[in-house]
Amino acid sequence: MSILSAILQGILQGLTEFLPVSSSGHLSLYQYFTGINSESSVTFSVMLHLGTLLAVIIAFRGPVWQLLREFFLLFADLFRGRLFKQKATPYRRMLYLLILSCVPLLLVLPLQDLITSVSADNDILVEGICFLITSALLFLADRAPRGHRDASTMKGKHALAIGVAQLFATLPGISRSGSTISVGQLCGLERSYAVSYSFILGLPAVLAAGILDLHDAATAGIGIEWGTALIGMAAALIFGLLAIRLVNYLIKSDKFRIFAIYTLVLGSVVVILGIVEKITCLLYTSDAADDLIGVD
C-alpha cells in the first residue's frame, strides 16, 4: 500500500468515524473500488480505528478521565462494602449506563464470522441497504423533539436501546455515531449529551474490536506494513479531531439533516450499482454457460 493511499484512507476514516455516515461503509467502498486486498485491509482498518480512538480520548479527555477515576473508585467502594450506600455521582451514573450499553456487544463474538464475511466480501448491495438504514434513523432523529435528559435523568432502558443500535452498527454502512446519536435523541437525550455519550461509548467497543482483529490477524499470519499503518493512523487522529468539532457544531445548529440526505443519496446509488453488478454477473454467467454448451 502506498503512503498516499494510507493518508487518504486515514482522512476518510477520521471524517466518517464521527460524521454520521459510516466509516466502515465508506472504507468498504474505497477498498472495493480500489481493489485492495481484503485480508490486509482488515488489519489496516483496525489501525485507523485506533487513530480515531485517540481522537476521542483527546477531545473528551475531561469526561474520560472522570469516568476512569469512577471506574477505579467503584472497585474501591465494592471492597469497602459501601457501593450502594451512597448516592452515585453524575459520572458514576454515566459509567453504569455506559457499561449497560456495552452488554449487547457480547453478541458480536458469536456473530464475528458473519460480520467479517459481510465486511470483506465483494458485494456492495449490503452496504447500500445499510446506508439507507442510517439515513432513515437520521431522518427520524431530525424530526424528534429536543430532549433534556442527561446522566442524571437517563434510564437503563435508554442505555440498552443505544447499545442495541451500536450492535447493528457493526455492519458496514450503518453509522455507529449516527445510529447511537439518533437513538439517543429518540430516547430524549439532550443533543450535546447524546454526542458525547455516543463517542465515549465507542471507546471500549473500538478497543475490544481492535484487539480481537489484531489477534486474529497475527494468528492467521497476516502481515501489516507498520510504516504506512502509522501514517494512516495519524491522519485518522487529526481529521477525527476536526470531525468531532464539526459534529458538535452541526447538531447544536440543527443542520444534522444534511447527513440524512447524503446517506440517502449515497445508499440509493450504491444499491443501484449493486443491482446492476448482480444483473451483469448473471448475464455474463449465462453467456459463458451458453458458449460452453456450444463448444461441447
At which residue positions do the language-model features occur?
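Hydrophobic alpha-helical transmembrane segments
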Residues: 7, 95-99, 128-132, 160, ...
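Membrane-interface helix termini and inter-helical loops of multi-pass transporters
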Residues: 112-121, 215-225, 279-283
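Interfacial segments of multi-pass membrane proteins
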Residues: 5-13, 26-44, 165-168, 179-201
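Hydrophobic alpha-helical transmembrane segments in multi-pass integral membrane proteins
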Residues: 167-174, 269-279
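Interfacial loop-to-transmembrane junctions
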Residues: 241-265
